[in-house]
Amino acid sequence: MKIVFFGTPEFAVPTLEKLLINPEFDVLAVITQPDKRRERGNKLTPSPVKNVAMSYSQWENIAHDLPVWQPERIKKDTETLNRLKELDVDAFVVVAYGQILPQKILNIPKLGSVNVHGSILPQYRGAAPIQWCLYNGETETGITTMLMDVGMDTGAMLLKATTPIGLLDNADDVAQKLSVIGGDLLIETLHKLQQKEIQPIPQDNAAATYASLIQKQDYGLDWSRSALQLHNQIRGFYPNCITTFRNQPLKITASFPLGAAYREELPPELQKMLQKLPDLSQISGSPGEVVSITKGVGAIAQTGEGLLLLREVQLPGKRPQSGWDFVNGTRLTVGEVLGNGS
């Protein structure tokens, strides 16, 4: 089967690799976003998908290079459109490409354009399904393959695969799991499409939810929210959630909402840390206030409902550090308040 692959971030890499190593598929070209400049050094950096495509001839001992195209705006790029039309292609595979494909491109392949989406559609259509799924405290997510149309993840569904979400899973953890699942599901989808063993199912638009692009203000931690809500925000928008500490920004990159109802889900090493904690049943404070510090564990902050253990934080210009190292390095004391410009 002849394929053109559209994709950009690390999430798309496992699917591309599975296509490249499978002799049943011939990847004719890879289309990815243009190289971007890094903040440090202003150096142009290729996408993860481009890196894989450019190294393909080396790790497969192939005599020819895999063509990589990087249109700035594919909707208006007539050269790319004409190139695609010239190919005798069976299917387009699209995984987190980053640009909307117009109908004139979607219509080119014989079997259609297949998208690998990181949610159980029709829930969490849009650009950030993994992040908002975690933010909302979902305990399960998955991958949906679909035939693309011009809408935002509105095409007819082909196959689905689900996976549980652990209480400590962050956006990177879930993305890594889903990227592998997505690659396997895509191969199965293409096989069934080719054999006409799959019936596309229209989405129920009334049941659809949306996962919009994350904005800078979404990263701010509001300590009046519950410990569980803050924990879900921290892991969903990992590693960017931010508060203030002594009038400077402080990222919180890992946390845990204290409460007996959650402890049976925890790995042994975290269980041991929690066993060191004193009785917290009579401890309280104002939202954001550090109400307890335990040696070898770290600081606990009051929230609008419940207590939040700060497992990992990051000060400006520093690397992430454990909650206990943060306490030691800053000489944090009980009674200090996070947030509100403190």
From Swiss-Prot:
This is Methionyl-tRNA formyltransferase. It comes from the Bacteria. Attaches a formyl group to the free amino group of methionyl-tRNA(fMet). The formyl group appears to play a dual role in the initiator identity of N-formylmethionyl-tRNA by promoting its recognition by IF2 and preventing the misappropriation of this tRNA by the elongation apparatus. One of its GO terms (molecular function) is methionyl-tRNA formyltransferase activity. GO terms for cellular component: cytosol. InterPro entries: Fmt (IPR005794), Formyl_trans_C (IPR005793), Formyl_trans_C_sf (IPR037022), Formyl_transf_N (IPR002376), Formyl_transf_N_sf (IPR036477), Formyl_transferase-like_C_sf (IPR011034), GART_AS (IPR001555), Met-tRNA-FMT_C (IPR044135). It catalyses: L-methionyl-tRNA(fMet) + (6R)-10-formyltetrahydrofolate = N-formyl-L-methionyl-tRNA(fMet) + (6S)-5,6,7,8-tetrahydrofolate + H(+). PROSITE patterns: GART. Its EC number is 2.1.2.9. The gene is fmt. (6S)-5,6,7,8-tetrahydrofolate binds at S119, I120, L121, P122. The keyword Ion transport does not apply. Belongs to the Fmt family. The keyword RNA-binding does not apply. Keywords: Protein biosynthesis, Transferase.
